[in-house]
């Protein structure tokens, strides 16, 4: 009798191939399928040569070569393609079989697929996979959610192939039902946008604001790896700043300053608006990429305003430390806002997400892996009900001690004309969030004046609503809409 596979993988692009090789390295028998049969042959004759990986040349063949309950992972483009493969697979599956979507699917699609497939007896998992090609090959961060009945069957495989912390803890655990895993992956990607933009703002301040050269900036980022800023993105930034082109000049200086995006940052911002969460830093990071895309327009407008940035002549060591503190404090706000969004979704959908465990999922293997994720985990383990990460004593102390330098860097950037949308958004958010009184009383009065939207009074119990006839004309009709 032929040997059956432990899991099947559909999709032999680089991510799919590397996950298959990772599974093989961890002792699992994998059946590989691609819609283009020649890709299967090429893979088996190339990267998968002399392994235990099995090829399949139709979906029927794939299903026949798997142990029951069948476990099939889709590594295909998000969207309609996922639904097409699910529909094509169903005739070859039985009740209890498991489909795993490992792509960057939008969580409402995962919600829908989990429910509709459960009605057909198929258990569905939507899992975020982060870490890129290298992570897929040697250990990614994996964020599974969906039908929890499927988790015991796929847990040994997914945890085996995931990244591990220095304590050998897998960066993979059950996130929650339905689309919880893909939602957490979406927020991860949004935080990634924020982290990258914050680093870029620090880089521009060092380069244009302080007039530092690339060797000096490389040394600074390399030094920051030995601080609380230690992270994958700081690490690769140090490498990038040191990299020379063929002519010996820094390569990054020759890269066109227009940044691309795939849309997950936008998804994060849209969901923040839908849930009413002030995800100000991440949305500014998305908009910064949008601004960068207008290269020709930026060149034209720059000639209208004749902006010249004059480097600061003060003690550069003090400014470098101030930038480090501003970067760290802003990063804390980015993660704080991200976890506020995760909490709101978890409560809204009753996902019961463990926030400390979520931080652990990102500790290794993914793009935002960093040392202080361990501190985030500690904060939520000490206080699972923690609403704002900055309220934890460890993070509160960092924010408080960074405040003066943080303000100094943002103010100076505005003074000399360096755009700093994310650092400015971060400190502005904290100023607003830590204010007992905001000018929203005037705003609500304006709404009541022109739209009879009503207001609450400070001298009356909450949820008691009032309307004023501000002009003495018209009636006392009040809008029924107070909050969005």
From Swiss-Prot:
User: What GO annotations for molecular function exist for this entry?
Assistant: NADP binding; phosphogluconate dehydrogenase (decarboxylating) activity
Q: Which GO terms describe its biological process?
A: D-gluconate metabolic process; organic acid catabolic process; pentose-phosphate shunt
Q: Which keywords belong to this entry?
A: Gluconate utilization, NADP, Oxidoreductase, Pentose shunt
Q: Which NCBIfam families match?
A: gnd, PRK09287.1
Q: How does it assemble?
A: Homodimer.
Q: Which PANTHER family match?
A: 6-PHOSPHOGLUCONATE DEHYDROGENASE (PTHR11811)
Q: What is this protein called?
A: 6-phosphogluconate dehydrogenase, decarboxylating
Organism (species): Haemophilus ducreyi (strain 35000HP / ATCC 700724)
